[in-house]
Amino acid sequence: MCIRDRERREQRHRDNLENGVALETVIRDYLSPKHRDRAATGCPTAALVAEIARHPKATREAFTGKMSDILALMAAQMPEATPAEQRRRAIAAYATMVGALQLSRAVSDRQLSEEILENAVDAALALAKGR
């Protein structure tokens, strides 16, 4: 059940990006306290990325394909930039988002967790906008 919920959430993020939901909305949703607090049904990337790194090449290739899809969807929402710049910004924003979500879940200090999320939203938005 847990994996299915995660897959649905990941698909919702993809659907949002494909359907033109503003990248800012996706970033804010991903880095929300609600998403942080629902680790069991949240993003599989944030939950499993360290484990995926230890898996065979075939698993990592499947992960790479899914991640590449997400990056392409994010990059497409970054107008007024070259394709290379869009990709660079998408990678930086997504890495910020995933890392911040992991850290916000790992710390025991609730205030620090909130600060991580809030600052990561600002950072990811700045990266997405090329600032």
Give the ranges of each region predicted by the language model.
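Conserved small/polar residues in nucleotide/adenosyl-binding loops
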Residues: 1-5
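Generic helix N-cap/helix-start motif at coil->alpha-helix transitions
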Residues: 6-10
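Hydrophobic alpha-helical connector segments
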Residues: 11-42
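Amphipathic alpha-helical segments within well-ordered protein domains
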Residues: 14, 49-50, 75, 101
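Alpha-helical bundle regulatory/interaction domains
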Residues: 20-23, 29, 55-59, 103
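Helix-loop "lid/cap" segments that line or gate small-molecule binding pockets
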Residues: 31-36, 45-55
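Hydrophobic/aromatic-rich alpha-helical bundle segments in the mid-to-C-terminal region
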Residues: 57-64, 77-131
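Active-site oxyanion/phosphate-handling segment shared across diverse enzymes
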Residues: 67-77
